[in-house]
Amino acid sequence: MNFHNIRLIARYESKYICRNPVFLGIALSGLIIIFIMQNLLQGKEHAGAWFLVSLSSAVPFINAYLFMILQSVLVILATSEWRTSEKRADTLEALRVHPFNNLVYITGKTLGVGIVLLVLNLLSMLLAAGINLFASDAPFDGLLYLFYGVTLSFPAMLFLTGL
């Protein structure tokens, strides 16, 4: 397998996904909804239940849980857009006749979707860390964000993308 071709296809796919206004709108509105929900559930002024702020793992866990829901919607949207874009003419003419096999092509496209989802996940974790530090009474532990990213968000992304 040629990793240069995989990187090229992944970069092309991630740019294509980020330029899609429907995907971008749903992703940004989903991040805003997650931010508002977390602020309402775990903020200082709106804390609904004590168990949502008593543990240092509460804020990163709720963030990972809400992001997994958003991630499932985004993967469905990205794969449906993938199929419709390939049916339309002139969207992938530069790559349609390709000097690489289909495994490289599918790996690159899946990696492109994964890169976009990982960036959105990092942005969601940064927003949750901001809530945790500045707007919540919950204790902060930065390693828990990494833990829930590795044990919840990343495996969910692998499962949803079909790897």
PLM region descriptions:
Residues 10, 14, 96-99, 135-136, ...:
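Hydrophobic, small-residue-rich alpha-helical packing segments that form membrane-like cores
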Residues 1-11, 83-93, 159-163:
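Cytoplasmic juxtamembrane interface segments
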Residues 80-115:
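Helix-loop-helix units of permease transmembrane domains in multi-pass membrane transporters
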Residues 15-18, 60, 84, 148:
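Alpha-helical membrane-interface segments at transmembrane helix boundaries
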